[in-house]
Amino acid sequence: MSYLAQITSPTLVLSERITRNNLQRMAIKAKTHGKKLVPHWKTSQSKEVGRWAREYGITEITCSSIKMAEYLSQEGWERIHIAFPFNVRELPKLNQLALQQRMSVQVVNPVTATLLARELKAPIDFFIEIDAGYGRTGVQFSDTATIDSILSIASGCSHLQFRGFYLHPGHTYYGKDNFKIHQESRNALKSLKDRYNILYPKLLTRLGDTPGCAVVEDFGEVDELGPGNFVFFDLMQVALGSCRKEDIALCLAVPVVDIQHSRKEILIHGGGVHLAKDVLVQADGSKNFGEIVLLHDQGWTIPKHYSYVKSISQEHGIIQASEELLASVQVGDLLG
């Protein structure tokens, strides 16, 4: 039986071929530049895709929570890093997880470092998260007093090992000058490595964001790359210039429940619950929550005619449909 015939409600469809191509491409890029690829797994969140990743030499991953790390543990990863300022209320869970999986966490203040040093029961590595302009979280790269304080606290605990500096230049997602942002980020990490390398000769620097890692060709002295969205990509990454539409490895199969020919609209069962509410603003000011592809048993085809999801609520989605799509679709069909 066709897999499409088994779909009755909004269903995620993944292309293994495209996913593997994306993993291989980024792995080759990292290797070509002499960097270690440690991808962020918060988008893919899949043990199976992780097994594919290891076929391309990927041995460590990053996630965003203890819960996700628990799910991904015992899958053969050399280390799982939690790339979110460590939540000290989860120390008991971290202690338990660290007994079965090598872990590293992110520290952004001396208070967290103190609690970790006092209560850890198993060895844990840590990165100090650095802010070089994004402004969301992290220690300002020029705030060496805070960095020194964190390192001093950690030096008194045999279970807490300094691994290096982590920087996520998330402002590349706002369509600014990605090359300039990456240059500033590399410079910040280099200045810190130059300052602390004598005391910590094995310290690493890690830079992670898909828009930058996908297009930049000069990573300087950064040791590790940590992009995440590149595994599947999406329309936002297309808009940022990170990839082509053909590189997007996911779509959502949705049932057609109504068609309004006079308004050129198609109502689908697929809304914010299924698509999230990320949105692209088009040149005419209209909102685009996703573009339509045509499903078949081998995956999907990107049509030459353009149709897109113009609005969503929790369960509903409304497609602004092309004439060609309106002429070919019926209530009960599936679209991607």
What residue spans do the PLM features occupy?
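Active-site loop ensemble at the mouth of alpha/beta enzyme cores that anchors a bound cofactor
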Residues: 213-295
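Active-site-proximal beta-alpha core segment in soluble small-molecule metabolic enzymes
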Residues: 38-175
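C-terminal accessory subdomain/extension
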Residues: 263-336
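Active-site loop/helix belt of alpha/beta enzymes
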Residues: 123, 132-244
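Expand to "…catalyze enediolate/carbanion chemistry for C-C bond making/breaking, isomerization
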Residues: 11, 20, 27
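Generic N-terminal amphipathic, Lys/Arg-enriched alpha-helix
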Residues: 1-14
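Alpha-helix-loop-beta-strand connector modules within alpha/beta enzyme cores
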Residues: 23-32, 39, 47, 56, ...
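Conserved, mostly hydrophobic/aromatic
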Residues: 19, 42, 72, 128, ...
